[in-house]
Amino acid sequence: MVAKWCVLAMCLLVAVGADKCPRATDQEAKQKRMLEVLQHVNKPYVAETKDPKIPAGSEDVFKHLGILEKHEVFSLFDERQWDEATTAAVYMLTAPSFDEFIDRAEIVRHRINEDMFYYAFSVAAVHRDDTRGINLPRIHEIYPDKFLKHKVIVEVKNSINSGQEDPLIDATHEFTDLRDPNSKLHYFLEDVGLNSHHYHWHVIHPAVWQESLEELTHQHKDRKGELFYFMHHQMVNRYDAERLSNGLPRSTTFENWNDPIETGYAPHLTIDRTGYRYQFRPDNLVVRDLPELTKNHMRQWRDRILYAVHRGEALAANGSSVSLRDERGIDVLGNMVESSLQSINRPFYGNVHCYAHVIAARIADPDGKYGEDNGAMYDVATSARDPLFYQWHKFIDNLFHEYKDALKAYSSEDLTYNDITIEEVNVQGEGGSPANTVTTFLENSIVHLDEGFSFTARGHARVKVQHLQHEGFNYQIKVNNAGGEHKVVFRVFLAPKYDEEHHEFDFNEQRGMAIELDKFVATVPAGSSTVEQHSSKSSVTQSNDNFYGSSATRSSENHCSCGWPDYLLIPKGNHQGVQFNVYVIATSYDEDHVESDESCHCGDSLSYCGALYDKYPDRRPMGYPFDRHADAQTFDEFKTKNMNSVTVTIKHTGEVKDA
């Protein structure tokens, strides 16, 4: 008997009456007007509209706008730009009607940096009631020159200027340089969807969100600090899984700021309209003090955070102590480490996460002596391309590991689900592979470039890019239920089985590398049954159409369009096959569910993106039960009867297919 299943978004809730977060009305008409505003961003060859006047009564607002120069790149990591970005976003977010929102957007657009405008407009649009669910162009559609190398942009420009109509440029030819081991990872580091996801996550959960905005919008960002920890923790784990798949050691931690950064990086990115060229970082440079920030400040902030972690309490701005040992502790710590405006004491705990991005991005010209532009680490849209991003976030991750390791390990009683036994787990691919073998391959997709960019002045163009893809597969979970019918939450993780030296991981080391693949609910009848779930229904990912489709045709079924690319759900593996453990843990729906309205959820990717306007619909800590130190050396010692695992081999076929 196959049990009924439903995704967590559908089940971990108790919704009564009308939707709390209904989608906006007149979506098509509103989307058209919003696209008309955005069509001018980064497009000098679109006819400009008349500069609207500042309305009476708004003069004080505009005293704080126009500070960041037009030719610069906006950085959410650079705190000096936060006030202006927040002012712009709040001014648009608090417009009393949709028409007023559009009017305010046009006024703001003419007066601030375009890069900053796109971010502020996106934050406002995502969080306004009357624009909820309306799809906007993603960052790679507005700024394709932040995602496509400059040589590709030049080829596009030359093709159009020579008279070609709708040319197709092939950007799939990337070569591995044996002198640069990280060149094996271009398919991951420079993936359009991965970097677009990272940018959009920071739109959904902006660091500049604060209590005053919650009061204005009546929207509480539930567990935002914990989401910052977990999403970036998962990015680091996924990066290390790709490194192991390519025969590379796991990334090192960037933690001693006096040591040379061994890994250089050349972005090969230029904003064509302005000539802004992302800085190249040679091997073995050492970060230096900035005029506005010293490394000693960074060390002081780090030490204060670690002191709070080890004491189990943090110092609030009003002088009171805030416990880090209760269920809110990880969220409080997440806001402190991200250095968001929801940090309980920003003057004391500082801005260690964001300013490390800034200090690393200016490593070759820290004081601006040579007039160089900043590196990829400076920009949220480009930072995840740089291997240093993962080394830095591994340091950030270690702050959270210190915290988690200080918590009491889960006992067998904590972990056991009395009536439920998982008897067997299998993973079955759809491509004819043997059981518990899944194949990956390369897939070609098309990035569409609209007319009006400096490189598409005379027409549209298309660019063929290549990304990882995998065959579809099913989880097959054999369950025995010793009681009556149960609603069960199934948590699915994947972790590499062997390290770079081909030694099997100790369980505590492995659980820290676990990648969440899915989290879903099934109604399990009494007795024996089999629960099946398809990989395409993952609670972690969003569909490929959100990256390579048109904003006009994308589904508006969820408010966020947030999540990891579906095609990167599993690591690449290799031709011989890389072994991973898939773990499945069953927990009680009755204990886990949180009263939450489905209409408010980020429908594509609950695990990474949460609920935009409501409670996170899962009571357990993110990453449970692998989030804490275990008093066990192996999974067999750790597991209870409601857990099981299987070894899965991921093989890369080397095939290239068209999407």
From Swiss-Prot:
Binding locations of Cu cation B: H353, H357, H393
Binding site for Cu cation A: H198, H202, H232
Chief location: secreted
Glycosylated position list: N318
Keyword Secreted on entry: yes
Subcellular compartments: Secreted, Extracellular space
Tissue expression notes: Hemolymph.
Residues making up the signal peptide according to the UniProt record: 1-18
Record key words, sorted: Copper, Disulfide bond, Glycoprotein, Metal-binding, Oxygen transport, Secreted, Signal, Transport
Membrane-spanning intervals of the chain: none
One function term, GO molecular function aspect: oxygen carrier activity
Pfam family, one: Hemocyanin_M
Domain of life: Eukaryota
One cellular component (GO) term of this entry: extracellular region
Disulphides: C562-C609
Biological role: Hemocyanins are copper-containing oxygen carriers occurring freely dissolved in the hemolymph of many mollusks and arthropods.
Record note on quaternary structure: 36-chain polymer consisting of 6 hexamers, each of which includes 4 different chains, A, B, C and D.
Family as reported in the entry's similarity comment: Belongs to the tyrosinase family. Hemocyanin subfamily.
Record's protein name: Hemocyanin subunit B
Organism of origin: Scutigera coleoptrata (House centipede)
